[in-house]
């Protein structure tokens, strides 16, 4: 029992480290600005992993917080809102997992809902921080679609990667994927 707990902590530390490295390595695409239309945070591919096993959620939440702490120009607002949004995504995957559908349908639905809520939450955050005009609605729509499109692309890539990877029975066993 104790070894499983240590194993889970180690897996989460690895996931957090990978999330941080990929977010910072691809920082120009990981963080939205007024000038960048589509936010492509490559590390969000790991978010799909929590659909298959929720125990990897803490690593993603920690990774998101540290990546935003180290790389985001938005400061404390992004540390809090970005981390909250990641936690909400994990919760959505946990809820969608209970639907009476095939796993593939559930992960696709969960990813779509997550991309929508990410666009709404992060789009609102970016509008609040960057919009310096009275045209908030137009600015928000641009930010929403930029984040939504980027997130849906990344989550689809994540679905493909994990669906293919988890055909390997040994990997499924190692990562406790049912």
Predicted regions, residues:
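Membrane-helix interface "capping/anchor" motifs
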Residues: 49-61, 98-106
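Membrane-embedded alpha-helical hairpins and interfacial helices in multi-pass inner-membrane proteins
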Residues: 24-36, 65-178
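Hydrophobic transmembrane alpha-helices
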Residues: 1-58
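Small-polar-interrupted transmembrane alpha-helices in polytopic inner-membrane proteins
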Residues: 19, 60-68
């Amino acid at each position: 029992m104790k070894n499983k707990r240590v194993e889970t902590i180690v897996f989460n530390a690895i996931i957090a480290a990978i999330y941080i490295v990929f977010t910072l390595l691809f920082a120009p695409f990981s963080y939205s600005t007024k000038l960048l239309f589509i936010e492509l945070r490559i590390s969000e591919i790991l978010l799909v992993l929590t659909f298959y096993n929720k125990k990897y959620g803490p690593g993603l939440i920690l990774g998101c917080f540290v990546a935003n702490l180290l790389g985001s120009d938005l400061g404390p607002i992004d540390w809090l809102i970005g981390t909250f949004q990641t936690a909400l995504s994990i919760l959505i995957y946990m809820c969608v997992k209970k639907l009476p559908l095939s796993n593939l349908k559930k992960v696709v639905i969960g990813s779509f809902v997550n991309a929508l809520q990410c666009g709404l939450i992060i789009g609102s955050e970016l509008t609040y921080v960057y919009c310096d005009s009275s045209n908030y609605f137009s600015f928000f729509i641009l930010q929403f679609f930029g984040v939504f499109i980027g997130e849906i692309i990344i989550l689809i890539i994540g679905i493909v990667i994990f669906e293919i990877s988890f055909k390997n029975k040994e990997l499924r066993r190692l990562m406790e994927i049912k």
